[in-house]
Amino acid sequence: MSTKFEYSIESVLLTSSVGKESEIKDLVVGLDFYESLSSPYIKCELSIIDAANLIESVPLLGQEKIKLHVKDLNTGNTIKRDFYIASINNYVKGNGQTAMYVLKLVTAEYMMNSLLLVSQAFTGTISDSITKLTKDYLKSTVKTSEKSNGDYKVIIPNWNPYKAIEWLTLRGISSKGYPFVFYDTLKDGLVFESYETIYAKSIFNKYVHRGGNTAKDDADQKAAMMNTALQYDIIEMSNTGKNVLRGAFGQGMHVIDHSNRTYNFITYDYDKDFKKKDRLDKFPYISDQFTVNNKKLTEYDAVHSTLYKNSLAFDTNNLNNYNNKGEFTKLESDPFMYQTGLVKITMTVKGRTDLTVGKVIDFEVERNRPVSVNTSKNSNEYLSGKYVVQNIHHKMEAGKYYIVMDVAKESLGKKVKK
């Protein structure tokens, strides 16, 4: 029985260090792409079976450019991206003239980041500064549909572009107090957006998992396969101890303004913040009935930080150096980012290149029902619901295309009751 291919390698055009072009698509037996919501670049790996002695005839020296053209046959989407060979790994000499190895690739933006330093002043919103920095230094474009709140005047002191972008992103906040992320996707390229925008997205797809881990051959209809979570595992459920130590549910900040000679102490309140911001689901993860020594968990603020306004220090966490709303950026962004991963699940689904990090999915999990429990509910109402895609591994091999992704949420679909 022949394999029905789910992707097509249209072209893998390699340009050597001296400008010689070679089409090597017939040597590629596997492609792996990695996206992360916390990474400004994607990673790519090409698995090669080389019977043409490419490694010597080109030769491969880690100074080559690759133009990649891949078609996703599950959706019809086409991917065209430029990469550079970063390294040659896992080299195994086979019989005769055959060799196997992996080409690890980096994006064109990654290469520019490695070659340039930013020494420049930027004035305006964080989103405008990142857009300009991406264009001028990474020679690329970034998709953004919103303006960050507040104006900054900053001087980047000989940093690589990615470091400058990371520094700026940490200081970005939306009009409603959501933090920003800067990331790269296989299909859409660079994106700069806030969690306010992410949470407002329509559900990209609904995935259903029924019973135990479903074998990859169980669903024989394409439509069913594209909506099936073939396998899932819970990576983390809250880890309350770690998040309490990080101040995810309560913390305080000492704000010292040298210029005005003032001192202020402000606190973060999880309960108030949860009600103020839109969330993936309706109910908070931390129960208002849970107490420690007769106090709610959210009433403790044992995690303290100090912020010096108008400080001359540049490379510090004193986020208010260049913006008078820095304390709110720090006090609201950090706890929120810790909360975004209170529930983490890794799952395997059918591959599609339009599924990227930053998308919102709906995940329905069938509940485990002991025979002693009589209920008409088929789904786990706590675990089921909306999730944000945080990490993705696109795996194309032997004609098959699967995605292994990490998804996360910070709220529950059902309130915990007695």
Language model features by range: what are they?
Residues 1-115:
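Assembly/oligomerization scaffold segments
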Residues 31-59, 213-418:
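An acidic/polar, Gly/Ser/Thr-rich interaction patch typically located in mid-to-C-terminal regions
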Residues 98, 106-112, 123-143:
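Glycine-rich, acidic and aromatic/proline-enriched surface loops and short helix-turn segments
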Residues 100, 107-109, 144-241, 245-247:
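Short beta-strand-centered interaction patches in the first periplasmic/extracellular domains
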Residues 114-123, 150-156:
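Second-shell loop/turn segments in exported
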Residues 133, 168, 203-205, 253, ...:
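Right-handed beta-helix
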Residues 137, 169-172, 365:
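Sec/Tat-exported extracytoplasmic proteins
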